Amino acid sequence: MEMVLAFLGFLACLIALGYGLYHLVRYVLKKEKRFSKRLFWPLFIGGLVLLFTGAALAEPDTAAANAEKKYSALNAEYKNLTKEHEELEKEYKSVSSEAKKLKDNKEDQDKLEKLKNENSDLKKTQKSLKAEIKELQENQKQLKEDAKTAKAENETLRQDKTKLENQLKETESQTASSHEDTGSSSNNTSKSDETKTADKAEGCNIKGSRNGIYHTPGSTYYDRTTDPAEMFCSVEEAEAAGYRAPKR
């Protein structure tokens, strides 16, 4: 899945760059401006997001695989060194046994000295092998911990991915619900405004014209004022709003 995301991201980026290069060449040669930013930028940015997402998801698996390979190689080397150590142990015991037998034989002093030197060299080699084995054991332990950590990080990333997908679904559901609530609220508000307007029209019949004059029912210009700026329920209310009575 991670490789598919990375491949799709790379392909989208490649198409976007090809599209941009094609229109750049056409602009240079023919001065044509038909480049669509709405097509180029979403395709290019979406490709980068897919590419980086695929690479990020694939990285923990790669790290775990590399750790497993290193662990296998070190384990094989550890077994080889252990085998060599056992062989040297046998050889050391054999040389020690021969040295003990030749110790009382004065005629073989040279051979005894040679065996002592060999024995000393074997001890040094044995000590070096023990140090290497200890180091390999520590490296082996560290690789086990690295592999365990890589697997844990991989599992954490998968859980985060699942959590993000669930959050995305929840957000989409909330968005759809919000649109429905908004539509319902708008309808209720419109009905409320219509009701208020009707009530005002029935009880408040003093018209305020746009030139600052109010007209009461039965006055000369009352019926002629067909588009009042405001409606008032009383003369006091109209005068308080800055309107005056007509001169005639």
Swiss-Prot record:
GO cellular component terms, A-Z: plasma membrane
Subcellular location: Cell membrane
Induction of expression: Negatively regulated by TnrA under nitrogen-limited conditions.
Membrane topology: Multi-pass membrane protein
Presence of the UniProt keyword Calcium in the record: no
Membrane-spanning ranges: 4-24, 39-59
Sections of the chain in a coiled coil: 61-178
Basic and acidic residues: compositionally biased ranges: 140-182, 191-202
UniProt keyword Transcription regulation, yes or no: no
Secretion signal span: none
Keywords: Cell membrane, Coiled coil, Membrane, Transmembrane, Transmembrane helix
Matching InterPro entries: LMBR1-like_membr_prot (IPR006876)
Pfam families named in the record: LMBR1
Region (Disordered): 94-123, 140-221
Name under which the protein is recorded: Uncharacterized membrane protein YttA
Name of the gene: yttA
